[in-house]
Each structure stands twice: as structure tokens, then as C-alpha cells.
Amino acid sequence: MPELTATPNLTALFGKAVLTGFTRRGTRLPDTVYEQPNVSVDRTHLARYDRVCEFRLTDELPVTYPHVLAFPLQVKLMTDPGFPFPLIGSVHLANRIIRIRPLRVDERLTLRVHVENLRDHARGRQFDMISEVLVAGEPVWTGVSTYLRRGGGSGAEKARERVEPPEPTAVWRVPGNIGRRYAEVSGDRNPIHLHPLAARLFGFPRAIAHGMWTKARCLAAFEGRLPEAYTVDVRFKLPVLLPARTGFAASTVDQGWGFELFDARTGRPHLAGTVTPGA
């Protein structure tokens, strides 16, 4: 297991992805596991993240924050020579977070990242990027990000049925600069989030919000109402074109919650998720 003594440099890795990534073709995922021990949380950075995602400023890490800590390890793995797909162009389909207990800002963390479960998708191939956080050798947080690499799929995806959105419990104005602001705190500087001109090169009429920002913003609305241990699943749907006016709806489902984010004017869905107690 390769052990990292410092956080990978995202600027260098994204440059590597641009220069070498588009020619990648492969059929197998690497079995590499990257580990970075003795990671401390920068309180200033945490406060900036909290403000961008609208979490309260506390000594407890937001449930989505460890994803930001592990993201450089994910990018390092996805830009390694043995990774079969280009980093640029990968689509974030879904994200699951399993929180075994809350994490505090003063705890020393070990980050661990690997990839698994390569499988077919109607539009190509999908795989799961697994991120783990351990404290004193004990797992306390797991994130599963499912990515799609388009091309070569069966094309047999079911047509989406038109579903009327629920009545919103809140309406949020999403500023046009949220992509740049989240990029600054997350390190995810994909050009589709930063500027309309760059987004148009990839087929979007305007810059779009990061999927993990939309998930974080939704979970910030639940602060103070969730148990210590829970699993939160999200499927990303249509992108949030910036600036935007979004509707948020939440309702109780069994012992947990269901929630949705959608365009407040058209009802077009952006995200659907569930929170289930326990881990």
C-alpha cells in the first residue's frame, strides 16, 4: 500500500490529466490503495468550506468535508498510468457517505483511497471510487463516488418519466460564482464549474455547480436533526446551471429522510437523496 507523506498537488495532477489523459484506454481497474496518515484539519480551510456550503461553524466536521480531504488522493489514483480512463470527462453519477460517528476538527486522520466495481452502464462503463477515514486505526467514515466514463455502452437506458416535483420547503438562490468559490475550497477546478466559456466547450450553456456542493448544501439544511451515525445516498440528475433558483424539498421516509433539489421554475430535477439512520 503506497503511503503518502504529503497531500498530492492538484494543480500538477490536473495538468498531467490534460497532457496525457485523453489517450487512456483500458479494461481493468488498478488494485492500488493510497494511504495518507496523520492528516490534520486546517481550521481556516474548514471555516471557508462551511461558509461556501452554508454549514454552521463548529468543531465538528460536516459529513461531506472528508470527501474534500480525500479528493487529491482520488485524483492521484485517476491520473496514474495504470488507470484505464481519462480523468477529464468522467461524470459523477452518485455518492454515498457512511458516517459511523461524528469527526472533530482536532482529530488526526488517516485517509485511504482505492477503486473497485467496474461494470457496464447504458452509456459506457462505471466504477466506484472508495474513500475511507480512519482514526486510531478504526474506520469512522466511508465515501463511495460512482463515476461514468461515456462510450461503448448498450444504449438501453430507460427513458425518464416526467415526475412533478414536490412542493418546496425552501427556495435557494445559487449565485453565479458558486462554482469558483467551491473550487477554491475543494480543489476541484474542472473548467465546467469555473466560467461559461469553458463550460460551453463541454456542451453546457453556462457554468454548472459541483455535484458535491449541491449534496453538501442539502445536508446543511438538516443540521441538528440527524443522528450521530447514518448513511446518505444521492443520485445526481440534471446539472445546476449558474446562476440558479432551486427548490429544496425534504420529507420523512420510514426512520429517515428523503430529499430533492430541483429547478424552482421548471421543476427539472438536480438531485435526489435519502438519509438512513445507522451505519
What function would you assign to each model-found segment?
Residues 1-94, 154-225:
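Hot-dog-fold acyl-thioester-processing enzymes
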Residues 1-29, 73-75, 93-174, 242, ...:
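HotDog/MaoC-like acyl-thioester-processing domains
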Residues 34-36, 142, 229-231:
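Hydrophobic residues on conserved beta-strands that form the core of alpha/beta folds
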Residues 61-115, 125, 214-249, 256:
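Hydrophobic beta-strand-centered segment that forms part of the acyl-chain substrate-binding groove
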